[in-house]
């Protein structure tokens, strides 16, 4: 009788033990911007900017941005033939976007926005790079929603996220 019970109890104890180990090993591996006390950096393509109940948020697709030697290395790993043909990452940068998950991030009311190029006048002939130009969040929203002259959704953006809220948006210039 004792052998029959131990035959059932032992597998249950082993399963319980394994589930505790598995649960313990996954605790802390999840990145949750809301629980982190330090700022996080993410590079994204912004898909939409929305306002709901007076709060502004963006929906974005996180990417991996590489430049210089890192771009050449990743490009060669992912496209050896292309890298051999042209000798390195095109234009000195490389974007990896293996996951098309969209995430919505709230934006702080006092978030800073830094641009490299955008439509200042409504004339395509006037487009010119102005490195690290600070604009207001309202200007950014206005410019982002204008797509007739220059589509800002085609640029990557570096976000600083503090306590789950975007505090800084920096446009990455691409040639």
Question: Model-flagged regions — what are they?
Answer:
Residues 2-28:
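Sec-dependent N-terminal signal peptides of Gram-positive bacterial secreted proteins and lipoproteins
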Residues 27-175:
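Solvent-exposed hydroxyl-ligand-binding patches built from regularly spaced Ser/Thr
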């Amino acid at each position: 009788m004792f052998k029959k019970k131990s035959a059932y109890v032992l597998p249950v104890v082993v399963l319980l033990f394994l589930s505790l180990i598995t649960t313990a090993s996954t605790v802390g591996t999840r990145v949750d911007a809301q629980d982190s006390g330090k700022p996080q950096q993410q590079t994204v393509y912004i898909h939409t900017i929305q306002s709901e109940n007076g709060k502004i948020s963006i929906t974005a697709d996180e990417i991996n941005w590489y430049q210089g030697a890192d771009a050449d290395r990743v490009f060669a790993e992912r496209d050896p033939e292309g890298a051999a043909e042209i000798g390195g990452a095109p234009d000195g940068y490389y974007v990896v976007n293996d996951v098309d998950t969209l995430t919505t991030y709230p934006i702080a009311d006092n978030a800073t926005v830094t641009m490299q190029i955008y439509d200042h006048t409504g004339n395509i002939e006037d487009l010119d790079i102005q490195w690290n130009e600070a604009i207001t969040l309202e200007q950014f929203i206005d410019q982002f929603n204008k797509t007739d002259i220059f589509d800002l959704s085609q640029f990557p953006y570096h976000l600083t996220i503090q306590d789950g809220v975007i505090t800084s948006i920096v446009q990455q210039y691409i040639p």
